[in-house]
């Protein structure tokens, strides 16, 4: 059995929909799935670690990296810049690992144009009320910032139609099961299985 090239997964959601928690639970259960660590100019939040959650850089450094063509995609969200390293992404996929990009719809649009084979997943909250409550419970943002995120969420959620899969995060365990099912189904696609089991298939078919 040989390893197949990994699949790139784009996962997007409005802030507070539970995307990060679902991705962490998925990769805790399946450590062979990797998560791309984006570069950002936003301030580090309590509990975050540079190089783990994000590569935290200055706006000047980010702009220079962009000028050098280091980013596969980049976007500005709430006044902060975010970008995905092109070289690291390709190395991970070539090594046979499935790779998750946690990016917004703007970044997803850019990636799809460059890598149309990528699979995309959008996560929605069960209601606007639930979304507001989750943002409030995080205790990370002021009321003003939360109000801004809620306004932005309506615009963001309208882009779910551009994605391959849609998950409603009402019950966390159920949503996690849906996410795992998407990854498992894609691993069983004929082309990927052919790459993995080429020798076996040749023997079976004589």
Curated annotation (Swiss-Prot):
Molecular function terms, GO-annotated: ATP binding; guanylate kinase activity
Enzymatic reactions: GMP + ATP = GDP + ADP
Main location class: cytoplasm
Pfam families: Guanylate_kin
Location within or outside the cell: Cytoplasm
Enzyme class, broadest EC rank: transferase
Domain called Guanylate kinase-like: residue spans: 6-184
Keyword Cytoplasm: yes
Entry annotated with the keyword Zinc: no
CC annotations in GO: cytosol
EC number, as in UniProt: 2.7.4.8
Residues at which ATP binds: 13-20
InterPro entries (UniProt xref): GK/Ca_channel_bsu, Guanylate_kin-like_dom, Guanylate_kinase, Guanylate_kinase_CS, P-loop_NTPase
Record key words, sorted: ATP-binding, Cytoplasm, Kinase, Nucleotide-binding, Transferase
Function: Essential for recycling GMP and indirectly, cGMP.
Family: Belongs to the guanylate kinase family.
HAMAP family: Guanylate_kinase
Protein name per Swiss-Prot or TrEMBL: Guanylate kinase
Gene assigned in the entry: gmk
């Amino acid at each position: 059995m040989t390893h197949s090239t990994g699949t790139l997964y784009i996962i997007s959601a409005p802030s507070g929909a539970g995307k990060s928690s679902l991705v962490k639970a998925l990769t805790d259960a399946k450590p062979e799935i990797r998560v791309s660590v984006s570069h950002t100019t936003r301030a580090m939040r309590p509990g975050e670690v540079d190089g783990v959650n994000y590569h935290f850089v200055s706006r000047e450094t980010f702009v220079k990296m962009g000028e050098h063509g280091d980013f596969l995609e980049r976007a500005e969200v709430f006044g902060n810049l975010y970008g995905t390293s092109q070289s690291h992404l390709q190395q991970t996929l070539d090594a046979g690992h499935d790779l998750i990009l946690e990016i917004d719809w703007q970044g997803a649009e850019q990636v799809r144009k460059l890598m149309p084979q990528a699979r995309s997943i959008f996560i929605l909250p069960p209601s606007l009320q639930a979304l507001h409550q989750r943002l409030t419970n995080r205790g990370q943002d002021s009321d003003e910032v939360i109000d801004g995120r809620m306004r932005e969420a309506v615009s963001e959620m309208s882009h779910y139609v551009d994605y391959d899969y849609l998950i409603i995060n009402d019950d966390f365990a159920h949503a996690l099961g849906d996410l795992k099912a998407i990854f498992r189904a894609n691993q069983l696609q004929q082309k990927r299985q052919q790459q993995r089991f080429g020798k076996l298939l040749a023997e079976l078919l004589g």
